[in-house]
Swiss-Prot record:
The protein's name in its UniProt record: Putative D-lactate dehydrogenase C713.03, mitochondrial
InterPro entries, per database record: FAD-bd_oxidored_4_C (IPR004113), FAD-bd_PCMH (IPR016166), FAD-bd_PCMH-like_sf (IPR036318), FAD-bd_PCMH_sub1 (IPR016167), FAD-bd_PCMH_sub2 (IPR016169), FAD-linked_Oxase-like_C (IPR016164), FAD-oxidored/transferase_4 (IPR051264), Oxid_FAD_bind_N (IPR006094)
GO molecular function ontology, one term from the record: FAD binding
EC number assigned by the record: 1.1.2.4
Organism: Schizosaccharomyces pombe (strain 972 / ATCC 24843)
One Gene Ontology biological process: lactate catabolic process
Amino acid sequence: MHSLQCRRVIPFGKLSLSLHAPRNALRFVHKPAFTFESYKSLHRDPKYAKLSEQDVQVFKSIIGKDGSLIDGLDKSTDPADLDAFNIDWMNKYRGKTQLALKPKTTQQVSEILKYCNQKKLAVVPQGGNTGLVGGSVPVFDEIVLNLGLMNQIHTFDEISGVITLDSGVILENADNFLAEKGYMFPLDLGAKGSCQVGGCAATAAGGLRLLRYGSLHGSILGMEAVLPDGTILDNLVTLRKDNTGLDIKQLFIGSEGYLGVITKLSVICPKRPSSTNVAFFGVPSYENVLKAFSETRSHLTEILSAFELMDNTSQTLVDKYSGTQRPLEDEHPFYVLVETQGSNKEHDEQKITALVEDLLEKEIISDGVLAQDESQLRVLWERREGITECLAKAGSGVYKYDVSLPLPVLYDLVNDTKKRLIEFNLLDDTPEHPVIDVVGFGHMGDGNLHLNIAVRQFDKRVEKCLEPWVYEWVSRHRGSISAEHGLGLLKKPFVGYSKSKEMIHLMKTLKNVFDPNGIMLPYKYV
């Protein structure tokens, strides 16, 4: 029988990148082309009015001194002040709004939308602008409605664990508040220092621990939202059970602002675990990753909180662009991060130690380490959470595909994508080839693969090679073209690969009920 071949992790230096940079502090040195220039098939819908000085004055009177407004029509305004609202964090999508509104209250949101609806002014709701599909920035000159100033935590019940808060509360701030009460927010994301809880709800973000805590569809108990005509929909209940008619709030979770603007949420939060363990494994094959996942679920059962998959390419990028070293001496084709969360430290350590011993004895994994303290735990998580930022440093851009697939075929998509790019003469080490490499990582626990193609520059040849081929591949294997990033602008043309014509028709029918003038989120979603 193998002895436990785990050693203490050598503390690494912190990532030199800021994973949680505030969006409004960013200045874009190299701005992307305007989205409407990159997407030639898109044309501004003439039914939408153009912003006037008179409109701006009305918005100023609505917001008053409480909120904030950036007026691009004012010649004294620095155009760069609107960049953080016009450009997504990947530096891929760029709108041309002349007005960013930051209301402070639900009533202000209501009055803004009522006026926009009457005047047929198009609106894009925006949270932390950390999205990956171009949903949170304008395509043309839509008004940006940013919820960042609506950031109050209103109530918390320490018995039930239900928190009521504004949609503009930063996810990390909400979790820090709950930590002081012995609770945690039931969602964790790599962008937690910038993303807002309302945006998380609007995109139905899954996060790192969906395996343990489920989706926001189950955690959100109540909601306040504003419809496009200004109607305030108050369903801010804190009840676990409410079986009185249709659960309307579910329509807004994952709607991306298509039906209205989420302004407040009530969320049930789990107790914060007193014991957390993290293991990091090197695995010789994807077949063994599947075996490791099965064994892990059997061994850890109720305390398993995360099972994250990373390929060797992703870890090579983290090595290169984070300035950190790998926790394992040798390179391996795949890596897995396993996390447990529980209430009994000794019990949890025994279970995860037994798991490692079993995986080594069965030769399912090649090597592994266990974090011995909080610092090492964070270091191991950075190997996973830092991938996205390191990809952004690898070249001039990244093509991102967030899909869900049956586990047996999940990584086949990465291999097939790489083969296809090579066949099309797009992937090579030389500068004349646009593609640098193909990276696969994701949430193994819920079948969510993040397929990333790092490029030296965005290139239409790459897009034509991959789209709709990737979506056809996913559809053929009974997967979903969007696991958690949403549809936005990027995936609107391809929703038919995951939803039937009848379902798309029903979604459009609901849109006409909630937003007959179509002012919310134009050119996107479905």
